[in-house]
Amino acid sequence: MKQSILLFLLIGSATLYAQSPKFHDAMSQAITELEKDTTVEQLMAVSNRFERIALAEKDQWLPYYYAAYARSIAGFITTDKSKVDEVLDGAQKFADIADSLSPGNSEVVLLKGMVLAGRISVDPMSRGQQFGMQSGMLMNQAMQLNPENPRAYLMIGQGLFYTPEQFGGGKDKGCAMLEQSRMKFETFEPESDIHPNWGENLLGQMMAPCGSGSSVPHQE
């Protein structure tokens, strides 16, 4: 009996080990594709690719995270506002699964806040207060969960940047938070080469007007 159990464990370990490089390679290739994608169609396609990886590795939060992330970006750049909610519904679904697999994860909580922020664009006048507050709470929670996460400061700073001063935002507050993000990026090291490591390019674009008197960069 002991020998059978030991053999089972050895076979299980060998199978897990054999799957790991395959999973890593699939993720790495999909992330490389994601970094190049710029259209809604491309982002939806790579989201589907991450979903296929997730279905093969159901206990891994990262493919669900990236499937949601790709759709959240697609939602932000979708010009047909009647389709935004449908795109973000998929992002929300995948983000919720990632959250269940990795509870209390700063990256996942931040992503859930981003999905809510994306819904505001459908009708800012009617949705701004509700989704803006919910999104802000999640982003602040993400920062509290991991104070060294530069993406949390980046997304909070972006939100402040585009929020009028009379509503608690403004360029000065946004730039101050973006500066904190810049400092966090200087020391940030992802857990691996397939863990979240995006944001520096966006930060550079957002910080361009800070302290220069330039106009606020265009937000898609």
Regions found by a protein language model. Give the residues of each.
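Amphipathic alpha-helical repeat scaffolds of TPR domains
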Residues: S20-E33, A56-T78, P103-V122, E148-T163, ...
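Bacterial Sec-dependent N-terminal signal peptides
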Residues: M1-F23
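Hydrophobic, well-structured mid-protein blocks that either form specific transmembrane helices
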Residues: D85-L138
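A contiguous pocket-lining binding segment that forms or flanks enzyme active sites
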Residues: R127-E165
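Helix-turn-helix repeat elements of alpha-solenoid scaffolds
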Residues: K36-R49, K83-K93, G128-G136, C175-R182
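Terminal, low-structured helical/coil segments at or just beyond the last alpha-helical repeat
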Residues: D172-C175, Q180-E220
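Canonical positions in the second alpha-helix
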Residues: I53, A98, Q141-A142, S181
